[in-house]
């Protein structure tokens, strides 16, 4: 599956970044009960954090791209945690947090940046449940933060 996703990313003009290290006292992923829980990931574009508040100093297109970059980081975390993407069975849920001005109400459209990329990469297995929430501030002034729950196949040596 990893090769197919790498090809699809190339067709889209995208590439997986290196999985980001945690910025505080947590781990990036936890595998439990056939699920991989992925901590909130921030959007990076060419190594720079995508910052700002949607509806104030950033527009919907910027938010969409930021959500897409968060999704890329989620896939990078899957690959790092699982040693590839071969164990990914389906994307179960995304939790999307959008740094929003009080009158910005297009959080679902921002979240589509991540949702549409997951469907492009994983097909029907990439279609997922989702929350899209506006918040007044995010860590490091990030424009978007997304966490995920992913169903995975048992790994080698699993009981």
Task: Please describe what each predicted stretch is.
Residues 1-159:
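Short, polar/acidic, helix-capping and beta-turn segments at strand->helix junctions
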């Amino acid at each position: 599956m990893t090769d197919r996703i790498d090809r699809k990313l190339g067709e889209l003009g995208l590439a997986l970044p290196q999985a980001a290290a945690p910025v505080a006292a947590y781990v990036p992923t936890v595998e439990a009960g056939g699920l991989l829980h992925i901590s909130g990931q921030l959007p990076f574009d060419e190594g720079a954090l995508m910052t700002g508040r949607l509806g104030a100093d950033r527009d919907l297109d910027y938010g969409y791209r930021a959500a897409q970059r968060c999704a890329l980081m989620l896939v990078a975390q899957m690959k790092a945690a699982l040693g590839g993407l071969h164990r990914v069975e389906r994307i179960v849920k995304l939790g999307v947090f959008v740094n929003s001005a009080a009158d910005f109400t297009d959080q679902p459209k921002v979240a589509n940046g991540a949702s549409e990329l997951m469907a492009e990469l994983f097909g029907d297995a990439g279609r997922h449940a989702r929350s899209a929430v506006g918040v007044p501030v995010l860590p490091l002034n990030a424009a978007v933060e997304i966490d995920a729950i992913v169903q995975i196949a048992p790994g080698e040596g699993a009981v």
